[in-house]
Amino acid sequence: VVLSILKNIFTYQKYLLNYNSEVYIFSELNEKSLALANSLYAKNPKRLIVFNDTFEKNEEETYELIEKAKKLNSICFKQDITTVNFNVHNKKKKILFFLIGHDDTENIEQCVTLLDTYKNRDNTHIYIFSNSLESEFMLSSCDKGKIKLRRINDTETLIFRNLYNEGYRLFENAVPIENVKKITAVIVGMGNYGQEMIKALSWFCQMDGYKSYIYSFDRKINAEVEFKSLCPELLDDEHNGNFEDDGESQYSLNIFSGYDVNDESFDEKILSINDASYILVALGNDELNIKTAYKLRRLYEKKGLHPQIQTVVYNNKKKKAIINATNFKGQKLDVEIIGDLESSYSEDVILESDIETLALERHKKWGDEESFWNYEYNYRSSIASVIHRKMKILCKMPGIDKPVDKRSEQEKSVLRKLEHRRWNAYMRAEGYSYSEIRDDLAKVHNCLVTFDDLSEKDKLKDDD
């Protein structure tokens, strides 16, 4: 016991000796926090890295993590992040807290405590990693004081960044049919990543000259029913599969429930989608994801087809082992890996996101910075808008490269109509439905109508 107390005293003394450093404090030492800490340290070794809750619950499991943490010259406290006094620090220097534990409830409880403890301190940031609705509501309603609070939904962040960086290929690989190009995307697995991608593709693929068809598979027999509960209007007959109204979102979304990737019925069904140009495999398990992705590559290769295939692989070592994998003939298996720790938990993605910077600039056209960070609705909507604007530019939409006041009336009309189509799909993917009045708690909105039914004032809001 005495040795443990002395160890804690020496650890805290080390913290005090770094009084003038920027401090990056993690609630836990785990694979995610270590990946982000490695990225921070690589950019600037003078930064002080602090891990909490590092006592050896299982020495064999934690030994490797602790050894890696030591290489960052980090400080490791055994106590919970809320019990260590980090206030004894230069007030001009930033303190950044990362609530990144595996227990979502604990992350939220720690966030509430830290907000109360440090709300009067300048230069203080809290990043809470959570996908739950509870944390979203807390972020919007709690007293933050002087603290800049950010919720990181790592599932949404991965899907949005993937579309921002690589999504243009969906348009490049679209198949010409008659006077348009057809985008055919297949999602295998409807867990968090699969659902997020389905919702995102519904608005992302809205583009003049293109038609989008989205197919998804899941082993659960009620997968379609569950998804329809999340996004009722996205799947209803009035909007799903309707390509006639150029002022409304246009897409076809089909969900195949009760299909196991290990069954022959799955093979037959997915191969009936002849013109698949994009496939995402997200089954919640690295090994199964890799196995299924390679299986699909083999099945489509037999048909002489070579769609873009991506799969989610969490483990960095597995990613490095398979990213350039070939068969015995030297043929590349050509499966793209997303979602690995190294690229998902990095400074560029979490702290210095270029997408966030552009989204904030966009939001400031009609709101202040505080409302961007404080309200998830504003944050997500602006991020989605930035992503789609990039695609409009890459697809060379007439007038998109000009300021609004320099566009012709025809260019303004076309771009406004397209932006409204995207917005309609985005809002329905967020779970909104039409109502004569707007009520965000009920997730209903009066502007969820075809473009021509908008007031002239509301049409101007669609300037992109």
Name the predicted role of every residue range.
Residues 407, 430, 444-447:
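C-terminal structured domain segments
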Residues 422-437:
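Conserved oxyanion/phosphate-binding beta-strand-loop segments in alpha/beta enzyme cores
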Residues 4-7, 433-434, 439-440:
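Mixed-charge, polar/low-complexity N-terminal
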Residues 385-394, 436-442, 464:
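Short, charge- and proline-biased low-complexity linear segments
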Residues 362-368, 437-446:
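Active-site-adjacent bridging/hinge elements
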